[in-house]
Amino acid sequence: MQAINPIWAEVQKSLQKTLSKPSFETWIRPAKFNCFENGLLTLIAPNTFSSDWLRKNYCETIEKTAKEICGYDVKVIFKSETNINSYLTNKENLDEKKVDHKTKSFSNNSQDISSKNRSKKPNGLNLRYVFKRFVVGPNSRLAHAAALAVAESPGREFNPLFICGGVGLGKTHLMQAIGHYRVEIDPEAKVKYVSTETFTNDVISGIRRDGMTAIRDKYRNVDLILIDDIQFLEGKEYTQEEFFHTFNALHESGSQIVIASDRPPNQLSGIQERLISRFSMGMTADIQPPDLETRTAILQKKAEQERMNLPRDLIQFIAGRFTSNIRELEGAFTRAVAFASITGLPMTVQSIAPMLDPNSVGVVVTPKQVINKVSDFFKVSTDELISSSRRKPVSQARQIGMYLMRQGTDLSLPRIGDEFGGKDHTTVMYAIEQVEKKLSIDPNIASQVQKIRDLLQIDSRKNL
């Protein structure tokens, strides 16, 4: 049952008189009282998006109103109910696994297991990419089943597991879900997720520094290795040689190997036949673009996770217009929520449809067009945009450019990094995450991104 506090009740009552009805009903009323101690008022928002929005736009107003009511300074902090529930769920799952491990004599000290599981962070894994967040459809049923089988019984019949499919269809999600599952089941498991670009860079660094022994130990002393974008081994002869021996060492030791690519093994070019043969010796599972029913389910699940109440007709509208991949679909969802929050318009098909043109940044847009449009818009040179300059105007423009290139082309993170002067894929990933976060809380950023999209849309139509 929700805790009731007279001070927060009075603050809400006062804000209801001063704020517009849509603002109050959307942001203030859903916020729950958590505690009030020593002048610190803690409120719980329904989700991370709402928490960030309240912090950015209403914190000062709430503090001022609370001071008027209390007669002394009050500080306000916001927590996300989504994160709290996620923490409690994870804790509950870990507690169950502690009992299971204890029953099986894996450990006599459940507290040790719990502390190890909390402190040991899986190498390179994104916390969002877990099995329970993956929506299974006819397009991905085989890949999901194979991934789950490998997670439950690694190093057996599906070794290697080769997951293939186009950009933004969930390959990385499934790979990393395997890693998370193994670490939850066995906190001592050595799990490593790595892109082919990172593996290549490590090999090059090892050669230059005469440190190949350390590199080999790093990649061969694991229980589960997850290699993403293996197609980028193309033409890299020495890296292929090193990966061949790494593959053999892992396979012979019984370690599980999971590989992802944008195409099946027999369609990879510029890669040694002996590697192709090894890629094909286990299980190959492909992921196809999701059908309408699956796309609808994906959006419904995302809305539930974000505690957003989107009308069913709007979900069906978005699902019907964005058909290429899941990344594009979720990007449309994020833009719709951000647009409605910033403009104050209702979440209806009529209000959202004009800004959800799937052709606004389509695959006909080239990396060069994105760089040129971003450069012109922010009035920075293209050389400066792809440089390593950390000046705020330049770095912000660069982040937006990376975000738009990810949304509007079929380039992978490493390839986008190459377009921006050879940046690492982790830099690109960070940039995209930053822009996605700002789109939800910063109207200025949202406006800039939309204006550049409009400019790219004009270019796109010229090329039709």
Curated annotation (Swiss-Prot):
Residue ranges that the Swiss-Prot or TrEMBL entry lists as coiled coil: none
Ranges where the record places region Disordered: 99-120
Segments for region (Domain IV, binds dsDNA): 341-464
Subunit structure: Oligomerizes as a right-handed, spiral filament on DNA at oriC.
Region (Domain III, AAA+ region): 124-340
Region listing for Domain I, interacts with DnaA modulators, in residue ranges: 1-79
Protein name: Chromosomal replication initiator protein DnaA
Chain positions recorded as ATP binding sites: G168, G170, K171, T172
Entries under SMART domains matching the protein: AAA, Bac_DnaA_C
CDD domains xref list: AAA, Bac_DnaA_C
Biological processes per GO annotation: DNA replication initiation; regulation of DNA replication
Record function comment: Plays an essential role in the initiation and regulation of chromosomal replication. ATP-DnaA binds to the origin of replication (oriC) to initiate formation of the DNA replication initiation complex once per cell cycle. Binds the DnaA box (a 9 base pair repeat at the origin) and separates the double-stranded (ds)DNA. Forms a right-handed helical filament on oriC DNA; dsDNA binds to the exterior of the filament while single-stranded (ss)DNA is stabiized in the filament's interior.
UniProt GO molecular function: ATP binding; ATP hydrolysis activity; DNA replication origin binding; lipid binding
Keyword tags: ATP-binding, Cytoplasm, DNA replication, DNA-binding, Lipid-binding, Nucleotide-binding
Region (Domain II) location: 79-123
Compositionally biased spans, kind Polar residues: 105-116
UniProt free text on domains: Domain I is involved in oligomerization and binding regulators, domain II is flexibile and of varying length in different bacteria, domain III forms the AAA+ region, while domain IV binds dsDNA.
Entry's localization field: Cytoplasm
GO CC annotations on file: cytoplasm; plasma membrane
InterPro entries listed in its UniProt record: AAA+_ATPase, Chromosome_initiator_DnaA, Chromosome_initiator_DnaA-like, Chromosome_initiator_DnaA_CS, DnaA_C, DnaA_dom, DnaA_N_dom, DnaA_N_sf
Family recorded in the similarity comment: Belongs to the DnaA family.
